[in-house]
Regions:
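Surface-exposed loop/turn motifs in large extracellular/passenger domains
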Residues: 1-67, 71-191
Length: 191
């Protein structure tokens, strides 16, 4: 873990705690563990939610298996990320931001992201690769959800830039999704 807020060392949604305000300069996480309960998983930031704000200049996460840049089990607000790079191992799933208890949750049960700004997000996985996963991406007041560039690539699974039921965003750059063997989607949303 780079930053973990919770009652124990496990990635347990029921024990996760809230981030009220967090500012990160550079966060660099790499897992090389090949066995154990998490089997080489690398989460950059893990918490229940962000209540006030989270800012980061650079987040780099490399997992021996799965890798996640920011995992918020219930969602969060006012996230500002300048640059985030996430890469997973040959059979691992990779995600930039997850707003859900787990990566396998249906999007209908995921949490909400509100007022986010991401300048550059790069995600690559051996299996599935996802830039942002949330039930909804919404804005409040005069704030806007501004997405710069998202690049997502997968060797052996789905590649999805943004996966959400509802998304209210301004795309300032481009979303590039590619998969060597399966489907690739820029934005996958129900509404």
């Amino acid at each position: 873990f780079g930053v973990k807020v919770g009652k124990n060392a496990a990635m347990d949604p029921s024990a996760a705690g809230d981030i009220y305000s967090l500012s990160v300069g550079e966060l660099d996480i790499e897992s090389t563990i090949t066995s154990g309960s998490t089997q080489g998983e690398a989460p950059g930031i893990y918490a229940k939610s962000v209540k006030r704000d989270l800012t980061a200049n650079a987040i780099t996460v490399k997992g021996y298996t799965n890798a996640t840049g920011i995992h918020l089990t219930e969602g969060g607000r006012n996230l500002t990320i300048s640059d985030m790079q996430v890469s997973a191992g040959i059979s691992g799933n990779a995600a930039g931001i997850i707003a859900a208890p787990g990566r396998d949750n249906p999007v209908s049960t995921a949490g909400k992201l509100e007022n986010i700004r991401i300048d550059n997000l790069e995600v690559s996985g051996g299996a599935d690769a996802t830039g942002i996963f949330a039930n909804s991406i919404t804005k409040s007041g005069q704030s806007e959800n501004i997405i710069g560039n998202i690049t997502v690539s997968s060797e052996n699974g789905l590649a999805t830039g943004i996966f959400a039921d509802n998304a209210d965003i301004n795309l300032g750059g481009r979303i590039l999704s590619s998969s060597a063997r399966f489907n690739a989607y820029g934005i996958w949303t129900e509404n």
